[in-house]
Protein backbone atom coordinates (compact mmCIF):
# COMPACT_ATOMS: atom_id res chain seq x y z
CA UNK A 1 0.00 0.00 0.00
CA UNK A 2 1.44 3.37 -0.98
CA UNK A 3 0.89 6.71 0.71
CA UNK A 4 -0.15 9.77 -1.22
CA UNK A 5 -1.14 13.21 -0.05
CA UNK A 6 -2.48 16.45 -1.45
CA UNK A 7 -3.12 19.69 0.39
CA UNK A 8 -4.85 22.64 -1.24
CA UNK A 9 -5.50 26.16 -0.04
CA UNK A 10 -7.50 29.13 -1.25
CA UNK A 11 -7.53 32.55 0.42
CA UNK A 12 -9.13 34.43 -2.47
CA UNK A 13 -12.71 35.39 -1.54
CA UNK A 14 -15.32 33.80 -3.81
CA UNK A 15 -19.11 34.16 -3.83
CA UNK A 16 -20.69 30.71 -3.80
CA UNK A 17 -24.40 30.01 -4.25
CA UNK A 18 -26.28 27.27 -2.43
CA UNK A 19 -25.31 23.90 -3.96
CA UNK A 20 -22.24 25.51 -5.53
CA UNK A 21 -18.83 23.86 -5.55
CA UNK A 22 -16.29 25.64 -3.38
CA UNK A 23 -13.06 26.62 -5.19
CA UNK A 24 -10.12 24.71 -3.72
CA UNK A 25 -7.43 27.09 -4.98
CA UNK A 26 -3.97 25.74 -5.58
CA UNK A 27 -1.83 22.84 -4.44
CA UNK A 28 0.23 23.61 -1.37
CA UNK A 29 1.75 20.12 -1.04
CA UNK A 30 1.49 16.93 -3.04
CA UNK A 31 3.19 13.57 -2.72
CA UNK A 32 2.56 10.38 -4.68
CA UNK A 33 0.28 9.73 -7.61
CA UNK A 34 -3.04 8.73 -5.97
CA UNK A 35 -4.36 12.26 -5.30
CA UNK A 36 -4.52 15.19 -7.72
CA UNK A 37 -6.31 18.51 -8.14
CA UNK A 38 -8.65 18.70 -11.14
CA UNK A 39 -10.37 22.07 -11.28
CA UNK A 40 -12.28 22.41 -8.00
CA UNK A 41 -12.19 18.67 -7.30
CA UNK A 42 -9.66 16.31 -5.79
CA UNK A 43 -9.40 13.07 -7.75
CA UNK A 44 -8.36 9.96 -5.84
CA UNK A 45 -7.37 6.75 -7.56
CA UNK A 46 -6.14 3.49 -6.11
CA UNK A 47 -7.75 0.96 -3.82
CA UNK A 48 -7.75 1.94 -0.17
CA UNK A 49 -8.93 4.42 2.41
CA UNK A 50 -8.46 8.17 2.12
CA UNK A 51 -8.58 10.53 5.10
CA UNK A 52 -10.16 13.86 4.21
CA UNK A 53 -9.71 16.85 6.50
CA UNK A 54 -10.63 20.40 5.69
CA UNK A 55 -11.71 23.75 7.00
CA UNK A 56 -13.89 26.24 5.17
CA UNK A 57 -14.43 29.80 6.42
CA UNK A 58 -17.46 31.61 5.02
CA UNK A 59 -19.23 34.94 5.41
CA UNK A 60 -22.94 34.22 4.81
CA UNK A 61 -25.06 36.62 2.75
CA UNK A 62 -27.79 36.36 5.41
CA UNK A 63 -28.00 35.53 9.09
CA UNK A 64 -28.80 31.89 9.81
CA UNK A 65 -27.50 28.43 9.07
CA UNK A 66 -24.72 27.68 6.62
CA UNK A 67 -23.50 24.19 5.71
CA UNK A 68 -20.68 22.57 3.79
CA UNK A 69 -20.63 18.94 2.71
CA UNK A 70 -18.09 16.67 1.07
CA UNK A 71 -19.37 15.07 -2.12
CA UNK A 72 -17.88 11.94 -3.69
CA UNK A 73 -18.82 11.46 -7.35
CA UNK A 74 -21.66 14.02 -6.97
CA UNK A 75 -23.16 12.26 -3.91
CA UNK A 76 -22.98 13.70 -0.39
CA UNK A 77 -20.82 11.70 2.02
CA UNK A 78 -23.15 11.24 5.04
CA UNK A 79 -20.46 11.62 7.70
CA UNK A 80 -18.95 14.75 6.16
CA UNK A 81 -21.28 17.68 6.78
CA UNK A 82 -20.49 20.76 8.85
CA UNK A 83 -23.11 23.33 9.86
CA UNK A 84 -22.71 26.65 11.62
CA UNK A 85 -24.87 29.67 12.35
CA UNK A 86 -24.19 33.29 11.51
CA UNK A 87 -25.75 35.84 13.87
CA UNK A 88 -25.42 38.59 11.27
CA UNK A 89 -24.61 39.09 7.60
CA UNK A 90 -20.87 38.81 7.01
CA UNK A 91 -20.03 37.02 10.26
CA UNK A 92 -17.14 34.59 9.86
CA UNK A 93 -18.30 30.99 10.25
CA UNK A 94 -15.67 28.24 10.27
CA UNK A 95 -16.81 24.80 9.14
CA UNK A 96 -14.54 21.76 9.72
CA UNK A 97 -14.84 18.55 7.69
CA UNK A 98 -13.22 15.27 8.71
CA UNK A 99 -14.00 11.81 7.34
CA UNK A 100 -12.62 8.74 5.61
CA UNK A 101 -13.68 7.60 2.15
CA UNK A 102 -13.01 4.26 0.51
CA UNK A 103 -11.87 3.70 -3.05
CA UNK A 104 -12.59 0.16 -4.19
CA UNK A 105 -10.92 -1.89 -6.89
CA UNK A 106 -11.40 -1.16 -10.55
CA UNK A 107 -13.67 1.91 -10.30
CA UNK A 108 -11.25 4.37 -11.78
CA UNK A 109 -10.76 7.76 -10.14
CA UNK A 110 -13.29 9.19 -7.69
CA UNK A 111 -13.95 12.90 -7.50
CA UNK A 112 -14.16 14.73 -4.16
CA UNK A 113 -15.63 18.22 -3.89
CA UNK A 114 -16.70 20.59 -1.13
CA UNK A 115 -20.22 21.91 -1.73
CA UNK A 116 -22.00 24.78 0.02
CA UNK A 117 -25.32 23.07 0.83
CA UNK A 118 -27.05 25.81 2.85
CA UNK A 119 -26.68 29.58 3.04
CA UNK A 120 -25.19 31.45 0.06
CA UNK A 121 -21.87 32.88 1.21
CA UNK A 122 -18.57 34.43 0.35
CA UNK A 123 -15.94 31.76 0.95
CA UNK A 124 -12.87 33.49 2.39
CA UNK A 125 -10.57 30.59 3.27
CA UNK A 126 -10.37 26.93 2.28
CA UNK A 127 -7.86 24.33 3.35
CA UNK A 128 -8.30 20.71 2.28
CA UNK A 129 -6.02 17.72 2.82
CA UNK A 130 -6.56 14.24 1.40
CA UNK A 131 -4.21 11.42 2.37
CA UNK A 132 -4.21 7.80 1.21
CA UNK A 133 -3.80 5.49 4.20
List each model region and its residues:
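Extracellular jelly-roll beta-sandwich "head" domains, especially the C-terminal globular C1q domain
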Residues: 1-133
Amino acid sequence: MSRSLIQTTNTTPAAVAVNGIIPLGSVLRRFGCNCRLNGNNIEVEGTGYYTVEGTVTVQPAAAGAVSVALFENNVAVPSAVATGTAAAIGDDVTLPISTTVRETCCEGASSLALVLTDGASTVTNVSLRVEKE
